[in-house]
């Protein structure tokens, strides 16, 4: 009985999942935390710098795979036919001529610029804005039109340009740059050299300005005009061809076969971003909006090519042929913070308890237990009295805004407070804010002629916090399907591995047998939906007003009168 393994590289940990290909049964799973990341190494949150050491990925992946394989019988281990990989993104790293991430070399071992630049690293805001301006020059090709019209600081070229400008040693040593979701399959298959490495359609199309209509990447002249420093250090084009994730990049290398105790015949499928594979694991069909909810959200929608036609959807994070399911257009959107907003509020409320624990060491364990109950208690308190009449209006931009219209300069805003606002009400305002952000994304599609036939949610928050999900359901004012599996991203990676290994002919056939089921479907409550509608309109008004205060300084000075007028809304 064929078994596929999915690897899901998240922000904090990597998950390995073994799945029986015939039934979709989840046989074994393991989660390994990144040790250096957990200690806060190589990060500077105050300056929005978040880096992952490649050894965190390698060590945690090996431990997770060995743990899963140890849970299988000898017969089952012999039945492993493929390994699939998904990761956060855009999370690129500089590599040398052999495809080694520079931080694996002694001279760069502790240099954050030689590591993977995590998706939520926002150090490249100015570089991203420069790319957007260049794309929009009159009379020139707009290379941003298939990625929503705005290039983000979270993406490939902005990060490359920022590091290249900042660190000449890394710039000199880098032969290329590679996304994490492409590098791990190459590592497992022994194909890391830039000329051998297969670039995934998903990462290239959504984050690297790659599109078939202009022959791949933008021309060298585009990068020269952006900043000649890129072409001075990197050979153009960095790559030309891309592959969908169902195409194998190779088989398990002799080194990794020995380390894992598996056959070298195990197929290694192409890589893609976590949420794209999560949508596949959830069994998503065309025009279903799939919300992968965690610290942030990634929203995925696939559409038939003919229905999309020549239309380009503005304000999203890209529309790419084959980025999710081959032969369909994959569209990506998302919220830069979701669960992170609740965690922030928990830290705010927990600060006095931390001080008390320092003063009273004997009470430390009791206080720690109380801290863990803060958010569940707030959720319950607001659910028991979900009054919306005096609910604070909050803008969910605590980590910038990804969609609609990416802008990482934005900050969170809390309005409509009074002396009667208590902790449950403020927490309710945060819940509503994340739901409003979800609706803004849905409307970004529907208002541009892309139908949303149904909405699905997956992830830990989706399954474990019905209060938050019901608020989303009421704000969206449509049914909300909760997907059963907690491991849809890893499951999606396993589905791609099964197709790469030849167990199934294509992704839809594999989904029929392996994808997760819908656990429950929430229905909107008409009265709450009507009340939320009024708050959503206020959320939109504040969004227009507040955004004026986070314009780049030059533009802000130019538009100051407009900013003041906006505040009178």
Curated annotation (Swiss-Prot):
Please tell me whether the keyword ATP-binding is annotated for this protein. Answer: yes
Q: Which reaction does it catalyse?
A: D-ribulose + ATP = D-ribulose 5-phosphate + ADP + H(+); L-ribulose + ATP = L-ribulose 5-phosphate + ADP + H(+)
List the GO molecular function terms.
ATP binding; D-ribulokinase activity; ribulokinase activity
Instruction: For this UniProt record, give its keywords in alphabetical order, as a comma-separated list.
Output: Arabinose catabolism, ATP-binding, Carbohydrate metabolism, Kinase, Nucleotide-binding, Transferase
Q: Write down the CDD domains for this protein, in alphabetical order.
A: ASKHA_NBD_FGGY_L-RBK (cd07781)
For this record, an example GO cellular component is: cytoplasm
A GO biological process of this protein is:
L-arabinose catabolic process to xylulose 5-phosphate
What's its EC? 2.7.1.16
Tell me the Pfam families matching this sequence. FGGY_C
Entries under InterPro entries matching the protein: ATPase_NBD, FGGY_C, Ribulokinase
State the pathway, as annotated in the record: Carbohydrate degradation; L-arabinose degradation via L-ribulose; D-xylulose 5-phosphate from L-arabinose (bacterial route): step 2/3
Q: What is the similarity comment for this entry? A: Belongs to the ribulokinase family.
Q: What is this protein called?
A: Ribulokinase
Q: What organism does the UniProt record list as the source?
A: Klebsiella pneumoniae subsp. pneumoniae (strain ATCC 700721 / MGH 78578)
